[in-house]
């Protein structure tokens, strides 16, 4: 079952609650941070980034127990 909401740190997609919410990687101050984020956003740049990340995430699906 999902346990994380948008903006919370996560390890894999299924932890994040919501049909369009994925566990994505962002960079904060040079450090990699995994957070639950929406696949779609109002920002076209983030959308393009998200599309690429989803393709990568789907290819190397992160699994967690």
From Swiss-Prot:
- Describe the processing and modification events after translation: Contains 4 disulfide bonds.
Cytoplasm is among the record's keywords: no
Q: Which UniProt keywords apply?
A: Disulfide bond, Neurotoxin, Secreted, Toxin
Subcellular location(s): the record lists: Secreted
Membrane-spanning residues: none
Tissue expression, as annotated, is: Expressed by the venom gland.
Q: Please list the GO terms describing molecular function.
A: toxin activity
Q: Which organism is it from?
A: Macrothele gigas
Member of which family?
A: Belongs to the neurotoxin 25 family. F7 subfamily.
Q: What is the recorded function of this protein according to its Swiss-Prot or TrEMBL entry?
A: In vivo, intrathorax injection into crickets causes death.
Query: Could you give one GO CC term from the UniProt record?
Result: extracellular region
**Protein known as:** U15-hexatoxin-Mg1b
